[in-house]
């Protein structure tokens, strides 16, 4: 047949396929989420997230060593306190779990890059992401506490803060607080487009952050909405966000693509606990090839426009990159 264009010509060998690959993935763009908890000598597996653990501060360096050897240099820290109260005071306590973990980690592994999740839900007795007035989350009263939390993280050694609470105005409040304290160069990665998703279930088990009543639909986004997500992203950029995150990843790559096209800031996405747990469960049953699925999910996120990928599979992806299986 007289064909001028034969797309298969560029698929003829692995070398050629890699040469013309449109999406490039590098280990430096991976972020690994880590859970730190109170106690001593603790390295406990999370039942709903096989292969993921909660670490006490004294055990955290062992995992940081493993990450360093894997070539993963970016960490997102989540704290699990023993004490919880109505206003989440442990979140901004200078001797809180995240603050102590940061100081210890920075002492032993100063070359790693530490990002902290800024929210109240792990620290409040009611499990909501802010201060309550009756059964409603009081937006403006929460902003000061979020800003105090972010500042306490930075002063303990955080290189970047990532507010995940979805309160209106939180980026501005944090930016102004950090600037006033002399931290003008500390970037903010905002969970700007965070949907009220069923994919968060295993995380809430891991962090002990399930709400005691109701849900988070009054502050997290309705998953039916696209234009609202764009509004959230643009608002956070105006308030000073340096990086915009879309969360979850797999079901929201349309939003990744939309925000990527409409803005000029780096885009991140978080492949969340439910996505991880689904892959693990299906792989355990022998229904899927875990490694190939992990690579395919990551590539789809980068293809949609992300330059930063938060994933519980960061160590595995780093190995796959080294082996030439992705990237």
Language model: regions and residue ranges:
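Alpha/beta enzyme core
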Residues: 13, 25-31, 37-327
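N-terminal amphipathic/basic leader segments beginning at the initiator methionine
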Residues: 1-21
């Amino acid at each position: 047949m007289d064909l001028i264009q034969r797309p298969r010509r560029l698929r003829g060998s692995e070398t050629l396929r890699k040469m013309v690959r449109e999406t490039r993935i590098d280990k430096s763009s991976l972020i690994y989420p880590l859970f730190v908890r109170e106690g001593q000598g603790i390295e406990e597996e999370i039942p709903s997230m096989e292969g993921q653990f909660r670490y006490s501060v004294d055990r955290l360096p062992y995992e940081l060593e493993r990450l360093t050897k894997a070539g993963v240099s970016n960490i997102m820290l989540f704290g699990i306190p023993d004490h919880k109260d109505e206003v989440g005071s442990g979140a901004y306590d200078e001797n809180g779990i995240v603050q102590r973990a940061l100081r210890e980690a920075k002492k032993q592994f100063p070359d790693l890059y530490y990002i902290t999740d800024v929210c109240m839900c792990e620290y409040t007795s009611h499990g909501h992401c802010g201060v309550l007035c009756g059964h409603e989350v009081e937006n403006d009263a929460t902003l000061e506490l979020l800003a105090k939390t972010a500042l306490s993280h930075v002063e303990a050694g955080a290189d970047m803060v990532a507010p995940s609470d979805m309160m209106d105005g939180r980026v501005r409040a944090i930016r102004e607080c950090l600037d006033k304290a002399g931290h003008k160069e500390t970037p903010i990665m905002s969970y700007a487009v965070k949907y009220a998703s069923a994919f968060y279930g295993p995380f809430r088990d891991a962090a002990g952050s399930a709400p005691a009543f109701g849900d988070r639909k009054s502050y997290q986004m309705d998953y039916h909405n696209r234009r609202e997500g764009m509004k959230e992203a643009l608002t956070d950029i105006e308030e000073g966000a340096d990086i915009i995150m879309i969360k979850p990843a797999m079901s929201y790559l349309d939003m990744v693509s939309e925000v990527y096209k409409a803005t000029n800031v780096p885009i991140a996405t978080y492949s969340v606990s439910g996505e991880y747990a689904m892959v693990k469960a299906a792989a355990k049953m022998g229904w899927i090839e875990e490694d190939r699925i992990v690579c395919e999910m990551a590539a789809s996120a980068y293809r949609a426009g992300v330059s930063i990928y938060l994933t519980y599979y960061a160590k595995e992806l780093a190995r796959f990159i080294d082996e030439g299986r992705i990237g």
